[in-house]
Amino acid sequence: MKPVAWIGSSYKDFRSFPDPVQDGMGYALFLAQTGKMHGDAKPLKGFGGAGVLEVVDDNQGDTYRAVYTVKFEEAVYDLHAFQKKSKQGRKTPPQDMEMIRRRLKAAEDHHRQHQTPRGSA
């Protein structure tokens, strides 16, 4: 099973969610660790395919989101966990999209530094 690597403040932010939200999103991350996809996980638009996923949960009128990538062989990288505050529909706010892009780059850098060269395992 792949480990979860938390980028930036995503772990602290995730742990601030209500327990029922943590449970549901935690299960989605567990499925990603085992190579499966939660039924509520959807590719995040703007990232070119199914490598960056978003899971959304509502709790007592508030909306919570976790964004993670399954692009890398060695880990599931949780890129961002946040409570959506914007009332402008379902679209992810631009400042959150920018943070996700920065953290995806950090995950890519981490992957490059820690990947096992092919044929050396």
Which ranges hold each PLM region?
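Conserved catalytic cores of phosphodiester-cleaving nucleases, focusing on short active-site segments
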Residues: 66, 77-81
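Basic, Lys/Arg-enriched alpha-helical interface segments
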Residues: 1-63, 72-75, 85-121
